[in-house]
């Protein structure tokens, strides 16, 4: 075992070896193989390239060097293309703070039977008069950045439960294709986390309609890990034991305290001074904007072509992407 595997239990070490093909004897070589590909993408500012950081991308892609580098490139490309989203990315940002206090996300104290961290979202808590969908997404990304520091979670991953109880048609009507695609790109395509399951409970018909719209943007692996339980909490409990769930989800624990995770982040001051935020690396947002200008951009010869996440040029459909998916008319 190398120092990079410190903090992993014997069980998780074995899991990393069997499921992820992690080999302590070749770990540094694996990391260097990914690092050597960085030169092929001069159009991207790779703001962090240390061993521990690259390792989480290898674990997320089961030590496939090419796929790990693709994910690393998309991680920074997403941040470059959405600069405003990552400015002031800290728990004390007003929008993020309010989203966190309303349980976006909630983080349960117990792990599931596979050692995965359980995130919960109570969708009806979204107060659209106080913060936006983007604030919720920023709060989730900040939270994931904090949690992914734990090597156990890099190996074991996460489970997400979304409770749609009392989520109104009016709330759903505020969602647009561009919003949902932004979330999919940020969570599915650009973050080194292993999601073992995404569970919908108490979802109304219009959530099924929204899912139909976003389904084409989901990878096959993601689709297979989405479970629509409806009002049947017994089917949820077959996968996640009720002993570790709050009463809102039919569990045996007390109701979830929405402010628990918010207090954790605020108490530890997870903000732009930590390792999770672009400002803390070495390249400022202003520098990124300069580097991305046409005069300084270089043509990439990478096997991972640029523009994987690139927004299309202004075309007729752009206006449609800004329209609500569900109309109140």
Swiss-Prot record:
Protein's recorded name: Clavesin-2
Keyword field contains Nucleotidyltransferase: no
Miscellaneous: Binding to PtdIns(3,5)P2 is not required for localization.
Gene Ontology cellular component list: clathrin-coated vesicle; early endosome membrane; endosome; trans-Golgi network
Organism: Danio rerio (Zebrafish)
GO molecular function, one term: phosphatidylinositol bisphosphate binding
Biased segments, Basic and acidic residues type: 308-319
Record key words, sorted: Cytoplasmic vesicle, Endosome, Golgi apparatus, Lipid-binding, Membrane
Entry-linked PROSITE patterns: CRAL_TRIO
Function: Required for normal morphology of late endosomes and/or lysosomes in neurons. Binds phosphatidylinositol 3,5-bisphosphate (PtdIns(3,5)P2).
Subcellular location: Golgi apparatus, trans-Golgi network membrane; Early endosome membrane; Cytoplasmic vesicle, Clathrin-coated vesicle
Domain comment in the entry: The CRAL-TRIO domain is required for targeting to the membrane and for binding PtdIns(3,5)P2.
Disordered, as annotated region: 293-329
Domain (CRAL-TRIO) ranges: 96-257
Lineage of the species this protein comes from: Eukaryota, Metazoa, Chordata, Craniata, Vertebrata
GO biological-process terms attached to the record: lysosome organization; podocyte development; renal filtration
PANTHER family: ALPHA-TOCOPHEROL TRANSFER PROTEIN-RELATED, CLAVESIN-2
């Amino acid at each position: 075992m190398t120092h990079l595997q410190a903090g992993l239990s014997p069980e998780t070490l074995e899991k990393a070896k069997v499921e992820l093909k992690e080999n302590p004897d070749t770990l540094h070589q694996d990391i260097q193989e990914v690092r050597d590909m960085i030169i092929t993408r001069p159009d991207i500012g790779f703001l962090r390239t240390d061993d521990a950081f690259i390792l989480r991308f290898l674990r997320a892609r089961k030590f496939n060097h090419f796929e790990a580098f693709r994910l690393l490139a998309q991680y920074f490309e997403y941040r470059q293309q959405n600069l405003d989203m990552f400015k002031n990315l800290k728990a004390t940002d007003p929008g993020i703070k309010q989203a966190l206090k309303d349980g976006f996300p909630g983080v349960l104290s117990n792990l599931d039977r596979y050692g995965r961290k359980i995130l919960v979202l109570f969708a009806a808590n979204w107060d659209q008069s106080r913060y936006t969908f983007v604030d919720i997404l920023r709060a989730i990304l900040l939270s994931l950045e904090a949690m992914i520091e734990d090597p156990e979670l890099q190996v074991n991953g996460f489970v997400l439960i979304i409770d749609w109880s009392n989520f109104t048609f009016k709330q759903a009507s505020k969602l647009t294709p561009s919003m949902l695609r932004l979330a999919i790109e940020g969570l599915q395509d650009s973050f080194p986390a292993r999601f073992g399951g995404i569970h919908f409970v108490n979802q109304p018909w219009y959530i099924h309609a929204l899912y139909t719209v976003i389904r084409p943007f989901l990878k096959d692996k993601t689709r297979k890990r989405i479970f629509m339980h409806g009002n049947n909490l017994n089917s949820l409990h077959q996968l996640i034991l009720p002993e570790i769930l709050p009463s809102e989800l039919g569990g045996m624990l007390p109701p979830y305290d929405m402010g628990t995770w918010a207090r954790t982040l605020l108490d530890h001051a997870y903000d732009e001074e930590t390792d999770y935020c672009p400002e803390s690396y070495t390249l400022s947002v202003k520098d990124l904007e300069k580097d991305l200008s046409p005069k300084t951009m270089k043509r990439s010869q990478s096997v991972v072509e640029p523009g994987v996440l690139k927004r299309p040029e202004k075309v007729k459909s752009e206006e449609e992407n800004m329209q609500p998916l569900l109309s109140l008319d």
